[in-house]
Design a protein with these regions (language model features):
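Acidic catalytic patch
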Residues: 69-93
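Short glycine/serine- and small hydrophobic-enriched flexible loop segments
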Residues: 50-53, 109
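Alpha-helix capping/helix-boundary segments
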Residues: 9-10, 44, 84, 104, ...
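Short, well-structured N-terminal submotif of metal-dependent ribonuclease cores
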Residues: 1-40, 53-66, 139-140
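Acidic, PIN/NYN-like endoribonuclease modules and their adjacent C-terminal/linker elements
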Residues: 2, 71, 75-78, 105-140
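Aromatic "clamp/platform" in nucleotide-sugar-dependent glycosyltransferases that forms part
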Residues: 96
Length: 140
């Protein structure tokens, strides 16, 4: 089974917050285990970029972006297509969730893999059976 990351999961790992070890374990599996992937929407990668830029500056954000885009991180990046955008927009229309998060949910649904997150907005979608979630600790 592979996994999908949202920005919460990647930021947890990058900032070495509680749950970072769990995210790193998935990344290690994607490096060493054939058929295991860590899917990330480019939209969520952009969210990580702007949050890193604000917290740690352009240099670190740029380095992360380049590492991810050049394949130096074991992330399977997924581009938004018109179909994916429409599916994400439909989720946003129905649920009180940030628009960027709808791309992570849509991707997890499409790939039929759990979403690794600690974002409390996702609880409702999990309760309604829209996706399986691997819960990371929520940050204080």
């Amino acid at each position: 089974v592979s996994v999908c990351f949202d920005a919460f999961a990647l930021l947890t790992w990058l900032q070495e917050e509680p749950g970072a070890d769990q995210v790193e374990e998935f990344l290690n599996q994607a490096t060493g285990e054939e058929g295991f992937f860590c899917f990330v929407s480019i939209i969520n990668l952009g969210e990580v970029y702007y949050r890193l830029h604000r917290a740690r500056g352009a240099g670190e954000a740029d380095a992360f972006w380049e590492d991810a885009r050049q394949g130096r991180l074991p992330l399977s990046l997924v581009e938004p297509t018109p179909r994916r955008i429409l599916q994400a927009a439909r989720l946003k229309a129905r649920y009180p969730i940030a628009f960027a998060d709808t791309f992570a949910v849509q991707l997890a649904q499409e790939m039929q893999v759990p979403l690794a997150t600690g974002d409390p907005e996702i609880h409702l979608l999990e309760r309604e059976g829209l996706l399986q979630v691997i819960w990371l600790p929520q940050q204080t």
